[in-house]
Amino acid sequence: MLDRLQSLEDRYNKLNEMLSDPEVINDSKKLREYSKEQSGLEDVVQAYREYKEVTEQLNDAKEMMEDKLDDEMYEMVKAEIAELNGRKEELESSMKILLLPKDPNDDKNVFMEIRGAAGGDEAALFAGDLYRMYSRYAEHQGWKIDVMEASSTGVGGYKEVIFMINGSDVYSKLKYENGAHRVQRVPETESGGRIHTSTATVAVLPEAEEVEVEVHDKDIRVDTFASSGPGGQSVNTTMSAVRLTHVPTGIVVSIQDEKSQIKNKEKAMKVLRARIYDKFQQEAQAEYDENRKSAVGSGDRSERIRTYNFPQNRVTDHRIGLTIQKLDQIMQGKLDEFIDALVMEEQTNKLEQIGE
């Protein structure tokens, strides 16, 4: 492990030199590429440097113990050694995690697709609640949201809402939200006070760059139509809505959010590229999972991952068996407790696999 850490520090130092080179500074592509690589090494290199410093201090302290010390000095050095040993162990654990293979999509922006599933109007209302929950979480993180397409029910609910989240390491945190989310609550229209169960599905797709997914014009069928609002009424007499069909995969994307056909087509193309990329990723993951299961949960969109029980103010994540009695705060976007636990679970799984 130490040899690998040393080679990473050498690479980090080399990147520092390269980023000071006028030739690189004037080449925006190289500058971006090297800056991104350096940023990815920052945490592990800092941990390794501290580890070397702590190891040196520990060796010095052990040498001191070999000298003739009075009782007071002996106890001081002994306490320092215990403290340094503790810190060294912490850094070793931290570096093991930092050396785990990273998901290449972790630093990407995402498209989120939320759909009301079982439960009719109540499912659509819950889909709206989830959209607002993720919007608030994105706000807390300093991320930016752009709605691509929304099919609202007119009472704060959504049959479907597709939105993009731009920011730092978005996919690394939101990838765990893939799956079916179940809600248990008394609908406002329920006079008897009975608890109803409804479901909404969430899909999280990493943004795909053009170089990652080659989409040929000849493979895309483009249809245009007049956009419509809630209930199907026409809101635009021009043919501004766009439907793209990727013939080889059968993936269809319809966007009518903008008044401009060009803008709708641009948005649809981004979503289409992400869905095609996601399809390839899912197929590759399914093949990998036949031999070994590495992720938290299966990532299956139909897998029930979480239950939100409003009467009891609790949320349970079924993948890790974690229940939190703070539903009101979670619906305000306070998702860190769940996300941190899911990240830790995945890291533990990966460490166990390495040890096998």
UniProtKB/Swiss-Prot annotation:
The modification N5-methylglutamine is found at residue 233. Signal peptide: none annotated. Methylated by PrmC. Methylation increases the termination efficiency of RF1. Its main location: cytoplasm. Keywords: Cytoplasm, Methylation, Protein biosynthesis. Disulfide bonds: none annotated. It is found in: Cytoplasm. It comes from the Bacteria. GO terms for molecular function: translation release factor activity, codon specific. It holds the Pfam family PCRF. GO terms for cellular component: cytoplasm. PANTHER family: LD18447P. Peptide chain release factor 1 directs the termination of translation in response to the peptide chain termination codons UAG and UAA. Belongs to the prokaryotic/mitochondrial release factor family. This is Peptide chain release factor 1. It comes from Oceanobacillus iheyensis (strain DSM 14371 / CIP 107618 / JCM 11309 / KCTC 3954 / HTE831). The gene is prfA.
